[in-house]
Regions:
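Solvent-exposed loop/turn segments at secondary-structure junctions
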Residues: 24, 38-39, 45-48, 71-74, ...
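Short, Lys/Arg- and Gly-enriched loop/turn segments at beta-strand edges
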Residues: 45-57
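SH3-family beta-barrel domains
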Residues: 1-37, 42-44, 89-107
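Boundary regions of SH3-family modules and the immediately adjacent low-complexity/disordered segments
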Residues: 1-3, 54-107
Length: 107
């Protein structure tokens, strides 16, 4: 598995929340601005979100990416639809890119 880079879409409303888990019911860790560069470490399936990107394409996905902004960042989950990774994160990282698989490898 390899990490993947991304950027928060520049037309997101204000700040995008990072959370402790893959859904809006999880506590907010912090909020990041549009245009923020990110590294996607893995993804999990969770609550479905919908967002229309600057090109006018509406994306709906239940993927939530575990993202960091630097090596010192503890990270958190952000709905994949708010992040421009250049494609579908589940295809880019594959089955081995799920956070569950990553946790198993780290144990």
């Amino acid at each position: 598995m390899s990490n993947h880079t991304g950027t928060i879409w520049n037309n997101t409303p204000n700040q995008v929340h990072r959370r402790t888990g893959p859904g809006t019911s999880y506590p907010i860790i912090d909020s990041l601005p549009p245009g923020q560069q990110l590294v996607v470490l893995c993804y999990s399936w969770g609550e479905t979100e919908t967002f229309t990107n600057p090109s006018g394409v509406t994306n709906t996905s239940a993927a939530w990416d575990f993202v960091v902004t630097s090596d010192q960042d503890a990270g958190g989950y952000m709905a994949d639809v708010f992040i421009d990774t250049g494609g579908d994160i589940s295809q880019q990282l594959g089955q081995s890119g799920t956070c569950e698989q990553l946790k198993q490898r780290l144990v």
